[in-house]
Amino acid sequence: PDWDMMKSIVEVHHPGIDRDLLKRSLDLFYQVRELDLRKRPSTSELIDWINVLVHEGAMVDSSTIPFVGSLLKNEEDLEKLK
């Protein structure tokens, strides 16, 4: 799905999500999907990752990916982002 459709999907699963968190997490999700990965993160992994971010009160910025293990499932992919 494109950015706007993904935003709508996330809002169904996380009604009332902080707008800044939503934008930053979607932007970072699509940046990660552009990388040369063995398994690009899917919609369900995005939903799971945002769930962790919300529950942990984590901040998202472009310099780090908190709880990246919730977003990427392949060990080689995780190593690429370290």
Question: Residue ranges of each PLM-predicted region?
Answer:
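C-terminal regulatory/interaction module of P-loop NTP-utilizing enzymes
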Residues: P1-K82
